[in-house]
Regions:
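Well-ordered alpha/beta subsegment
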Residues: 103-128
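Conserved active-site and cofactor/substrate-binding residues in soluble primary-metabolism enzymes
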Residues: 14, 35, 111, 115
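Terminal, regulation- and interaction-focused segments at domain boundaries
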Residues: 1-26, 125
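Beta-strand/loop substructures that line and gate deep hydrophobic ligand-binding cavities in soluble
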Residues: 79-105
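Short glycine-/small-residue-rich flexible loop motifs, especially phosphate/cofactor-binding loops
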Residues: 20, 37-38, 121
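Short glycine-enriched loop/turn motifs at secondary-structure junctions
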Residues: 1-2, 24, 46-49, 85
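Compact, glycine-rich, soluble single-domain proteins
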Residues: 29, 35-81
Length: 128
């Protein structure tokens, strides 16, 4: 699987408030927020569950990745998804950077991805 998943007891709105704080505790900031529900309604006229994609960045790791390989920017930021499950509880998913970086074949980026994965895993573990 190319991501890590955690089902929460929290509602979607509660999770949206908590996820940035959990990410911040591991040195990430949320750079972008894409409202998929709103975008699909506006562009296609279709209804979709509440679903947001947060673009999370850990500046020291991003800088080191870019210093290693400028093409690493294609893999940034780390996407974190928050959506409303069928039971109205929130589900949070985070990209597994080791999976996306594997395609580069760059061992230095692989090491960085392992460290970022650990931080994302810890951030998810803070959520309930």
């Amino acid at each position: 699987m190319f991501g890590m998943r955690k089902s929460l007891r929290a509602t979607y709105d509660e999770a949206l408030a908590r996820v940035p704080e959990a990410l911040k505790s591991e040195g990430f900031g949320v750079l972008t927020e894409i409202d998929i529900q709103s975008t699909l309604k506006q562009k296609l006229g279709v209804d979709f569950r509440r679903y947001k994609i947060l673009g999370a960045c850990n500046p020291p790791f991003a800088h080191e990745a870019l210093e290693t390989d400028l093409a690493a920017g294609l893999l940034l930021p780390c996407n974190v998804v928050v959506y409303e499950g069928d039971d109205r509880r929130a589900v949070v998913m985070a990209v597994d950077p080791t999976q996306t970086v594997a395609a580069t074949g760059n061992p230095k980026l692989g090491e960085l991805a392992e460290a970022v994965k650990e931080k994302l895993t810890r951030a998810l573990s803070r959520l309930e």
